[in-house]
Swiss-Prot record:
Entry domain remark: The presence of a 'disulfide through disulfide knot' structurally defines this protein as a knottin.
Location(s) in or outside the cell: Secreted
Keywords carried by this UniProt record: Disulfide bond, Knottin, Secreted, Signal, Toxin
Positions annotated as propeptide: 20-30
Name of the protein: U6-agatoxin-Ao1a
Cysteines engaged in disulfide bonds, as pairs: C44-C56, C49-C61, C55-C72
Signal sequence coordinates: 1-19
Amino acid sequence: MRFYIAFFFLLLAADMALSFEIGNSEELERLSMVYGEVESERGCTHGSCENGETCCDGWRCRYTGRAVPFMCVP
């Protein structure tokens, strides 16, 4: 019985972690849309910087280890 309870909480934790990750992806997408107009005018980015793009507003290019490996972060 203890095994089933532990397994349930393990599944719950995994579900919460995936929900958090999806939420962050949606937030990054929203921010990239907001900053998109500013970026095109200034020639810098708040998004992906894996091809040598310059980050805006003092943000730095960092390795994220996700689908887009290098992103500009505050």
